[in-house]
Swiss-Prot record:
The modification Hypusine is found at K36. GO terms for cellular component: cytoplasm. This is Translation initiation factor 5A. GO terms for molecular function: ribosome binding; RNA binding; translation elongation factor activity; translation initiation factor activity. The lineage of its organism: Archaea, Thermoproteota, Thermoprotei, Desulfurococcales, Desulfurococcaceae.
């Protein structure tokens, strides 16, 4: 299971949400009551984990939204293959590839062959978060 459901009103800045099929981190959130008989609305601004694109969502606070399940693991970079890193999981010894473009610039500068990294598995995709 890579997603669960939660009420939009329960989420806070720093939480994760799925908008347009992409997992995102909430960077700004505001709530407003629309009038005497209207329900409160939430305005969510989020940044995509993989595309780094800004996404917005305006919906009632009692709306059920998808929240991605994030699995955190430790791995080691075993090869630099130009546009990708080959990473080995430190628990299962499984190897996989991660695109360098999905890693932030300042983190990418600290990485090299033999570096231990923390990576997340989000909705079936892997993302290197930080060196250990």
């Amino acid at each position: 299971m890579s997603k669960v459901y939660d009420t939009l009103g329960n989420l806070k800045v720093g939480s994760f949400i799925v908008i347009d099929g992409e997992p995102c981190r909430i960077v700004e959130m505001s709530r407003a009551k629309t009038g005497k008989h209207g329900s409160a609305k939430a305005n969510v601004v989020a940044i995509g984990l993989f595309s780094k694109a800004k996404k917005t969502l305006v919906a009632p606070v009692d709306t059920q939204v998808e929240v991605p399940v994030i699995e955190k693991h430790v791995g080691q970079i075993i090869a630099d293959m130009g546009t990708m890193y080959q990473v080995m999981d430190m628990e299962t010894y499984e190897t996989f590839e991660v695109e360098k473009d999905s890693i932030e610039e300042d983190i990418r500068n600290k990485l090299g062959v033999g570096s231990e990294v923390e990576y997340w598995v989000v909705m079936g995709k892997r993302l290197i978060i930080r060196p250990r």
